[in-house]
């Protein structure tokens, strides 16, 4: 490999690592202090970078929100790959519900989700950023439900795929409630969640 090319790749890797460190620090600050109470200096200090270095990567907290959305997209990529497995629609569907419920109810994820939801209600640009990730999940889950209908696993009702946003809403609301309760009752809640959603869609 050309030395200049190798050096450029090394620099790019360092930049990406620094950006990730800053975004993770921003997430920690938002969870601990809230979006508005967290300053760029707070984030720089937690990330272990100078304030000037932080501004080299992100001009403001809105850009940091974009970084958080990118991290969420990376987490969701695992779920999207799962939903592509239409060989056994019911099994894939149940696995998705379990994994998404577990992911959302994780204490840090739940706290950050609540903070972002609060800010998104006041800032449409932030809402749009995270809605893109949600729409990707909706489309992938729609595809699984349609595959399940063709396989006879799910009800043939043409309205079934339109339930996808409601399914995500139910999982998220249930997960956040469990997170608020400190995780108590998570196992029972997960089973109940599966049963309720099965009533909606299973043939």
Model feature map: region roles:
Residues 83, 98-104, 112-122, 195-200:
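Helix-loop "lid/cap" segments that line or gate small-molecule binding pockets
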Residues 127-131, 135, 149-196:
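Hydrophobic/aromatic-rich alpha-helical bundle segments in the mid-to-C-terminal region
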Residues 23, 66, 94, 138-146, ...:
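An amphipathic alpha-helix signature
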